[in-house]
């Protein structure tokens, strides 16, 4: 499925893939103001947990007084609302005086940021969009606002790396759509009036929206509220022509099991659905008396190194609970009401129909489970079935994979990447030849195999290709053309091979062999077209009076002046290419989104080419258009309003500068609307970034992104402080370079400080930032960066904001981020990189924020707890805020608003005046205006590390 997540909307063009809205995150679109649940008390489960420390010994007395005042206000707070009426969100009373407000900030209660920030975050969300298979209709999927904290507070089971809502039998914290509407795409490029999908229950929560192959039906799940909880999901279908929706099953006792695979279209009238087994009964009960001690043993002396995974199974009771919630009964359900159970209940994780709709690839997990790795490494069976449920054969039964090495490019032993060819019903897989250990030197390293769905007796798998790097997938076209990808992270090498799957006498050849870091040499990716079977294959293009084999290459067009996306017509045999489309370079940033003339058999004619493009500028949000050949006629099909008109005239510039070692650096500088440095003077500045590793100085210095891209502002984005008249230095590059055999992190601190110094000097030189009023911030690895900069470069920054970070690398001993040496192999590196070890050096105010339920590997909540205690133990001015029920990324409106309030308070108090005992802290929150304590204090707010897409949306690994 193609998704385009710009500032405030998203497209999907793959009708066979499930559409389910993402959980709100810093990159999510702006969302609408929801009703907030009332809180009867200000308990620690419902209110932000704040810890603070001040160098002044009087703080303890003042904190005690503040706590007493909070207790006296608790009942009043629980009855008030942010607008002065209605249900409460647990916020403090708006009648508090300025002095009381800052004292109360030391305690508990959710707060609101100033109106200029709040209004941007509360802007209405634009629907997500999905094209029909024939590209003649657009489905508008309507979304709700930021969810209330009550949604996150629902009980959840944490099992094998999965968080489960046991009442619904779904993943917990699932967001949803609230309504569906269909527009016909008219010949002139305009949209018909909306046809609303009717019949959906009031308040229905919609997920997993998918088109049938012929585009005549939609399938989706619906949950409704029952006694304060969401019901178990039920599968519904809608007739696209009439717009009428109805339940798929006649029985009201058949529910969807949405823990793993939900449902797939087998043909245009039949779905294969994962259902809750009707006979499963009540969930297992935890024994009151344990049957014995918990034991882990390694008497076989097996080397098992794993990262700090979270939410793992703890005992046999957890294993039983995992089986209970994850096990499904597969059911074939036709639109005419016919129902047939297939197979036996099992933990099915994937259902993949073949291109001819005769076979299924069925994947399932089974025991023995593990207590040290998540379910993705559990024993796994992959089988071939017919679509009516008949077992054909077993492809593999992979054992438990606890011993995958931590080195980059290490993989599971045995068959992997098992799937169908996109152009015919043949199974495809890769097998490692190095035992999965990237440190082993072997050739070949991977072998790619292919075999028909039902091989003849004695028929051996066919070797499709042998690779010396790690296999990375295949783009299929037909028996004469496919592209095989391989790469190796340590060297950043990536290669693309051309093969002829149906011709053994045609030798594979290398098409591209380059560095993945070298964005200037990126030739682009082949464009795919949709087949009648619903799969995607390489689009072959036919030119008039030309027998060449042409494909379309869609590239980002990175240049020293910024990205200029392009579309090339590429001769796969000669390497010759012709640029048939290119983005505007002066004012607009345009991209090719998808091929729209793909519902045709055979090669596509150049003169019939139709593509979907996007267009935006620094101040104009993204709109979508159709472009038709041969005359390149443009038909705009969307007209989304500006999501935050109050910042429509913000100033944006991509700036370049140099580090003292000669490395070229870039950043995006944002300035408030109407700001003139010659008249207004320098501004307070927020420096928000995220480091990245590189193998070469040249690659590190390349420009990424475009100066003409629209400034999308997420709900926790640093750009929100443009509304508070800050200069924002967004994503200043902080390359940590390890050339040759050198590991990047061997000189982490040195390169980190040098990059920050260069960025600060540049904004000061330009006269837009006051040197004494620059704050630094980031989340996850960006929070780690923030703490290190305050420890090793305190002269650069007035204060810091660190959200959901990890600060003590000895607590992640088997690697972190892109570091794959262990603590015992690189002890000095782990210690020197850990700001925890330099807590005694941090003298500038630091705000720590963390979700109480952070499940990101490496960033356990205790990282912030322990770092705060280390800082407090050395008299640092610090504040820690722990957000109840929040994970690595924050989603509840109460949490997000409080994070913004905490961040704004910190900036106004310690950056704008740049004094630790400032007596002003302007805050126009409904709950009261902030005022400084009479003693130096530090406190905290929160934001996740894993969602800052402005800086690291394309990072290769999960942030640790």
From Swiss-Prot:
Q: Which UniProt keywords apply?
A: Chloroplast, Hydrolase, Plastid, Protease, Serine protease, Transit peptide
Matches recorded under Pfam families: Peptidase_S9 (PF00326)
Transit peptide region: 1-62
Q: Does the keyword Transit peptide apply?
A: yes
Q: Does the keyword Plastid apply?
A: yes
Principal subcellular localization: plastid
**Compartmental location:** Plastid, Chloroplast stroma
Spans of biased composition, class Polar residues?
89-98
Q: PANTHER family given for it?
A: GLUTAMYL ENDOPEPTIDASE, CHLOROPLASTIC-RELATED, SERINE PEPTIDASE S9 FAMILY MEMBER
Q: What is this protein called?
A: Probable glutamyl endopeptidase, chloroplastic
* Organism per entry: Arabidopsis thaliana (Mouse-ear cress)
């Amino acid at each position: 499925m193609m998704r385009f997540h710009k500032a405030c909307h998203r497209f999907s063009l793959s009708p066979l893939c499930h559409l389910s809205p993402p959980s709100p995150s810093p990159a999510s679109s702006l969302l609408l103001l929801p009703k907030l649940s009332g809180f009867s008390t200000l308990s620690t489960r419902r209110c932000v947990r704040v810890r603070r420390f001040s160098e002044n010994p009087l703080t303890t007395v003042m904190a005690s007084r503040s706590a007493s005042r909070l207790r006296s206000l608790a009942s009043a707070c629980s009855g008030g609302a942010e607008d002065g009426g209605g249900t409460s969100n647990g916020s403090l009373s708006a009648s508090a005086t300025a002095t009381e407000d800052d004292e109360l900030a030391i305690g508990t209660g959710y707060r609101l940021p100033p109106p200029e920030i709040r209004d941007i975050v509360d802007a209405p969300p634009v629907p997500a969009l999905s094209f029909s298979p024939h590209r003649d209709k657009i489905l508008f999927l309507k979304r709700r606002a930021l969810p209330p904290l009550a949604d996150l507070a629902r009980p959840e089971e944490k099992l094998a790396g999965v968080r489960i809502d046991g009442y619904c039998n779904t993943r917990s914290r699932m967001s949803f759509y609230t309504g569906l509407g269909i527009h016909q795409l008219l010949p002139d490029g305009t949209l018909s009036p909306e046809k609303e999908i009717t019949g959906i229950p009031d308040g229905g929560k919609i997920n997993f929206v998918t088109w049938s192959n012929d585009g005549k039906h939609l399938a989706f799940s619906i949950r409704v509220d029952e006694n304060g909880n969401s019901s178990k999901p039920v599968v519904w279908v809608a007739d696209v022509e009439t717009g009428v929706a109805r339940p798929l099953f006649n029985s009201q006792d058949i529910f969807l099991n949405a823990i793993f695979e939900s449902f797939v279209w087998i043909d245009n009238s039949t779905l294969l659905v994962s259902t809750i087994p009707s006979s499963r009964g009540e969930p297992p009960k935890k024994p009151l008396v344990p049957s014995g001690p918990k034991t882990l043993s390694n008497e076989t002396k097996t080397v098992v190194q794993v990262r700090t995974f979270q939410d793992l199974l703890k005992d046999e009771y957890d294993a039983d609970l995992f089986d209970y919630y994850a096990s499904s009964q597969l059911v074939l359900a036709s639109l005419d009401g016919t129902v047939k159970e297939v197979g036996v209940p099992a933990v099915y994780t994937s259902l993949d129909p073949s291109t001819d709709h005769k076979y299924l690839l069925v994947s399932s997990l089974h025991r023995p489970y593990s207590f040290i790795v998540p379910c993705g490494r559990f024993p796994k069976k992959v089988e071939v079935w017919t679509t009516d449920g008949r077992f054909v054969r077993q492809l593999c039964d992979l054992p438990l994979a606890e011993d995958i090495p931590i080195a980059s490019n290490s993989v599971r032993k045995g068959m992997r990447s098992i799937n169908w060819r996109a152009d015919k019903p043949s199974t495809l897989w890769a097998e490692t030849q190095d035992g999965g250990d990237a440190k082993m030197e072997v050739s070949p390293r991977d072998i790619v195999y292919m075999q028909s769905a039902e091989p003849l007796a004695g028929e051996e798998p066919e070797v499709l290709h042998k690779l010396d790097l790690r296999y990375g997938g295949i783009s299929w076209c037909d028996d004469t053309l496919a592209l095989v990808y391989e790469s190796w992270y340590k060297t950043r090498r990536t290669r693309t091979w051309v093969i002829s799957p149906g011709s053994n006498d045609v030798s594979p050849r290398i098409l591209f062999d380059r560095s993945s870091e070298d964005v200037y040499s990126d030739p682009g990716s082949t464009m795919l077209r949709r087949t009648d079977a619903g799969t995607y294959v390489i689009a072959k293009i036919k030119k008039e009076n030309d027998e060449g084999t042409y494909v379309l290459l869609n590239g980002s067009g990175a240049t020293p002046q910024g990205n200029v996306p392009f579309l090339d017509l590429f001769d796969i045999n000669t390497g010759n290419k012709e640029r048939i489309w290119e983005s505007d370079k002066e004012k607009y940033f345009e991209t090719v989104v998808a091929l729209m003339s793909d519902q045709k058999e055979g090669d596509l004619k150049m003169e019939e080419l139709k593509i979907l493009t996007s267009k935006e500028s620094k101040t104009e949000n993204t709109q979508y258009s159709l472009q038709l050949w041969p005359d390149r006629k443009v038909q705009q099909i969307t007209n989304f309003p500006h999501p935050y008109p109050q910042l429509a005239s913000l100033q944006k510039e991509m700036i370049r500068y140099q580090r003292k070692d000669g490395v070229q650096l870039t950043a995006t500088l944002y300035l408030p609307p109407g700001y003139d440095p010659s008249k207004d003077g320098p501004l307070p500045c927020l420096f928000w970034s995220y480091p990245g590793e590189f193998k070469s100085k040249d690659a590190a210095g390349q420009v990424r992104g475009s100066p003409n891209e629209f400034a999308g502002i997420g709900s926790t984005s640093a750009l929100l402080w443009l509304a508070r008249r800050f200069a924002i230095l967004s994503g200043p590059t902080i390359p940590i370079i390890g050339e040759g055999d050198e590991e990047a992190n061997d000189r982490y601190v040195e390169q980190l400080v040098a990059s920050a110094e260069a960025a600060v000097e540049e904004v000061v030189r330009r006269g837009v930032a006051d040197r004494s009023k620059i704050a630094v911030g980031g989340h996850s690895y960006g929070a780690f960066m923030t703490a290190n900069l305050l420890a090793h470069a305190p002269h650069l920054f007035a204060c810091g904001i660190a959200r959901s970070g990890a600060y003590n690398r000895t607590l992640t001993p088997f690697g972190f981020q892109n570091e794959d040496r262990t603590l015992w192999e690189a002890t000095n590196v782990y210690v020197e990189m850990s700001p925890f070890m330099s807590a005694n050096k941090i003298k500038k105010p630091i705000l720590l924020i963390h979700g109480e339920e952070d499940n990101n590997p490496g960033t356990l909540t205790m990282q912030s707890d322990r770092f705060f205690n280390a800082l407090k133990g050395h008299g640092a001015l610090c504040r820690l805020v722990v957000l109840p029920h929040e994970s690595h990324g924050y989603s509840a409106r109460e949490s997000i608003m409080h994070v913004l309030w905490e961040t704004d308070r910190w900036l106004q108090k310690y950056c704008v005046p740049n004094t630790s005992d400032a007596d002003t802290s302007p805050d126009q929150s409904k709950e009261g205006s902030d005022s400084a304590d009479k003693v130096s204090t530090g406190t905290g707010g929160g934001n996740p590390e894993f969602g800052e897409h402005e800086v690291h949306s394309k990072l290769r690994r999960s942030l640790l």
